[in-house]
Amino acid sequence: MTAEDSASAVAMSNPSPSSSSKSSSGHPQHHCTVPEGVAGAPNEAALVSLMERSGYGMVQENGQRKYGPPPGWQGTSPPRGCEIFVGKIPRDVYEDELVPVFESVGRIYEMRLMMDFDGKNRGYAFVMYTQKHEAKRAVRELNNFEIRPGRLLGVCSSVDNCRLFIGGIPKTKKREEILEEVSKVTEGVLDVIVYASAADKMKNRGFAFVEYESHRAAAMARRKLMPGRIQLWGHQIAVDWAEPEIDVDEDVMETVKILYVRNLMIETSEEILRQTFGQFNPGCVERVKKIRDYAFVHFASRDDAVVAMDNLNGTEIEGSRIEVTLAKPVDKEQYTRYQKASKGTAAATTVESTQQSYVYQCDPYTLAYYGYPYNTLIGPNRDYFIKGTVRGRGRAGASSRGPGPRGSYLGGYSAGRGIYSRYHEGKTKLPDKPYEIMSNLELAAVNPVGIKPGTMALPALGAQYPTVFSAAPATKLMEEGKIHPVEHLINPLALQHDPTAASATAAVIPAVSTPPPFQGRPITPVYAMAHNIQRIPAAAASLYGAGYMPIAAHANTATLAALQKNAAVAAAYGGYAGYMPQAFPAATFQMPIHDVYQTY
């Protein structure tokens, strides 16, 4: 919104001298003609009263109702940084309630309330103040203001976006050629920003950013350059709003002692950067972090950082002309939202920072960090746009709406805004993968959905060892995991050998006389865990496979025959829990199988 737009809005709201009259005291009285958009409104009388009190005009156009500018205002509209975004407005709240709240912190230049066809608001508005400090005060004091009982307003900074992203540009085109071509088809072009390819500095990255003199000029250019209408150099182009640069508080920027270096050669090492930036004061560089063709240089003091920036900006390092600026801090909450949107996940990201409340953004125009190829910017593959805390302009010219399916209030290309990787170097988690920890033990699923951990029963040990069993701790190596859980289970039972007790225990275990339901499935190997234990009678010999191996030399093993010598226990591994009562008496205790054989 420009001053010219506001002036025309006032003219529309006061179309003729007859629309207002003067009282005997000489003060204007706006009561003869009600502006379009106010007439027929649910609170028409309250809006007219507000206009009479303040002297501001009001008109509705392009889906928004504009209140302002102040009477007698001359000159251009307030500079960037004077506008705020107001969200979470109840749909039946209008200017007569909003204006008194927001004019309490400063002089309002203009308020734009987004309206629906049914006469209700769309839940958000933009308020522009005459001074930057008034807008900052509004964000600080009116965020979470209770406009109605239990209804809180959301207030944050808004950015007057004047920059467009244009993709599909031939990579051989220079900045001057792009500026000339774009100026032929659009008006109000101020500058063109082009970045060299990371691999070949003689080529561009296939896209550029065009800066316009006003938001209105940028909006008109965007409408004219929409895909399918105009081709540049015979190529189909992609046009959208560029992500506006975040306005960082001046007090915060005065504390920054980290430099952002852009347009480096990929081969340039961190050591070369350390030497180059540390030449003005040896030892002043604390850390260098290089990511593809850009880097962050940390200094011990801000003065050293400023000296290096002033001397090295625009110079060449290994044949490439570099750009050096102070790194802009980004609020941690906003950074987390950037991460969630860019990664396509709702999981929160833990952020660490060297300063109390900020992490540092890197090149707002590179796709290097996120790793998206350029073709994701064109056509239907534009699903990674970020959702920032700053809010773009309303529907005036830009036709921007609330959060759409792309999850962005800005509706524009993020252009790969990366965040300094020092604060998010977490690697992608590998998918969980099960491993067999017994190489020759087959676990068969008896349920088409999944394996439910079964149980196995050990006779007469429940009272003797009530708490002896515990889950095996996880092992780091897969090969260790194949052996360690079983050893962990056996060790608590490693009692001194007692032949008499062993024989008595063996006598308790009855022979299996009925055919098992899994006959024909060889169970191998089966181990006898203690010597002097009688084998199951020959009637059940068919249950053993050819790999049966009695272990008779271990003097420290206890009476663990029921664990793996008995066929019923082996049957439990196959999921046939119904077969277990045939081999075990009632005096048993239960132990989950997954505590013995875990998968990792």
Swiss-Prot record:
Q: Which InterPro entries match?
A: HnRNP_R/Q_splicing_fac (IPR006535), Nucleotide-bd_a/b_plait_sf (IPR012677), RBD_domain_sf (IPR035979), RBM47_RRM1 (IPR047044), RBM47_RRM2 (IPR034440), RRM_dom (IPR000504)
Tell where it localizes.
Nucleus; Cytoplasm
How is this protein induced?
A: Up-regulated upon viral infection.
Is RNA-binding one of the keywords UniProt gives this record? yes
Instruction: Identify the keywords attached in UniProt to this record, alphabetized.
Output: Cytoplasm, Methylation, mRNA processing, mRNA splicing, Nucleus, Repeat, RNA-binding
The protein's job, in short, is: Single-stranded RNA-binding protein that functions in a variety of RNA processes, including alternative splicing, RNA stabilization, and RNA editing. Independently of its RNA-binding activity, could negatively regulate MAVS by promoting its lysosomal degradation.
What's the name of the protein? RNA-binding protein 47
Record the organism: Danio rerio (Zebrafish)
- Gene encoding the protein: rbm47
